A protein has these predicted regions:
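Short amphipathic alpha-helix that is part of the acyltransferase structural core
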Residues: 1-28, 115-157
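Conserved donor-binding loop and adjoining core beta-sheet/short helix segment
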Residues: 3, 23-88, 183-199
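Alpha-helix C-terminal capping segments
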Residues: 16-20, 79-83, 97-102, 130, ...
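Acyl-donor-binding surface of acyltransferase catalytic domains
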Residues: 54, 59-126, 251-257
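A conserved beta-strand-loop-helix scaffold within acyl/acetyltransferase catalytic domains
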Residues: 59-61, 150-202
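Conserved acetyl-CoA-binding loop-helix of GNAT-fold acetyltransferases
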Residues: 73-81, 203-205, 209-223, 243
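Short coil/turn segments at beta-strand junctions that form active-site/ligand-binding loops
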Residues: 86, 172, 194, 227-228
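Conserved beta-strand-loop-alpha-helix junction that forms the acyl-donor binding cleft
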Residues: 92-97, 189, 229-242, 247-248, ...
């Protein structure tokens, strides 16, 4: 049975966090609730239970639905619910979604069990500066230019959302500068006490091949050496992340409304 969550007590929140731990789908689904709670109309959440045990958790954040479930989940009920609730974008395991959403885009979930296991060397360039949780405009500009379409909102929307999450310690942005010029980005889209979900890994086209991306990733891993680290990538990038110590642990599927 799927139930809408109107609120969460501290104890219920801790139990939900534990349920979502160890999965990029759980981490991404839990992120909006961790950052905003359930008191805003742009964050909604549901859980599925069977015989009293939680088997799935879903969140909807500005129209994007993320699904996290266990092997014991009632998958037919979940898929029926997704059709009913509606979404502008969908994210979950390819195993769960691919037969129902044939036009979705699949990719690889990569993970490090501990940040300290990262084998990235980074750039040896002497004049590099790591700028944490600042320079939002430069971060937005570099990411937008390097990866068109990654950011779906305008700068005002980005600033409002990310600055809120950074203030609450549930996200971080990192901008890399070379000789004072912004050249690369990486973000912790979700940060919990023991896990990171990284994204926004981007380098300006004319600056690629200089190990700037691995420099940013290494900076996060050095800062959080005991955290489990997740990121998602296209299949053609799998080898790059494996070279940095990451291992593929799952396949994801994402769907935009235009692909329905």
């Amino acid at each position: 049975m799927i139930k809408f969550l109107e609120s969460l007590s501290s104890t219920e929140g801790d139990a939900l966090a534990a349920f979502c731990e160890g999965s990029v789908f759980g981490l991404k689904a839990f992120g909006p609730v961790l950052s905003y709670g359930l008191g805003y109309d742009f964050v909604s959440a549901w859980e599925q239970r069977s015989e009293g045990e939680r088997t799935a958790f879903l969140s909807k954040y500005y129209g994007t639905v993320t699904v996290h479930c266990t092997p014991d989940a009632d998958r037919e009920e979940l898929l029926s619910f997704l059709k009913m609730v509606g979404f502008s974008a969908l994210f979950g395991s390819a195993e769960l979604l691919k037969n129902s959403y044939l036009h979705g885009t699949e990719g690889c979930v990569m993970a490090l069990e501990k940040g300290r296991e990262c084998t990235a060397k980074g750039s040896a360039e002497p004049d590099l500066e790591l700028c944490w949780d600042n320079d939002y405009a430069d971060f937005y500009e570099v990411l937008s230019e390097s990866n068109p379409g990654y950011l779906t909102g305008d700068y005002a929307d980005f600033l409002t959302d990310f600055s809120h999450r950074v203030r609450h310690g549930t996200a971080h942005i990192l901008l890399l500068k070379s000789r004072g010029r912004p050249v690369a980005t990486t973000a912790a889209l979700v940060k919990t006490e023991g896990e990171l979900f990284l994204g926004g890994v981007a380098t300006l086209p004319e600056e690629r091949g200089k190990h700037y991306a691995s420099t940013c990733l290494l900076a996060f891993c050095d800062r959080y050496p005991e955290h489990r680290v997740f990121l998602c990538c296209r299949p053609e990038k799998q080898a790059f992340y494996e070279h940095l110590g990451f291992a593929k642990v799952n396949d994801f599927l994402e769907l935009e409304s235009s692909q329905k």
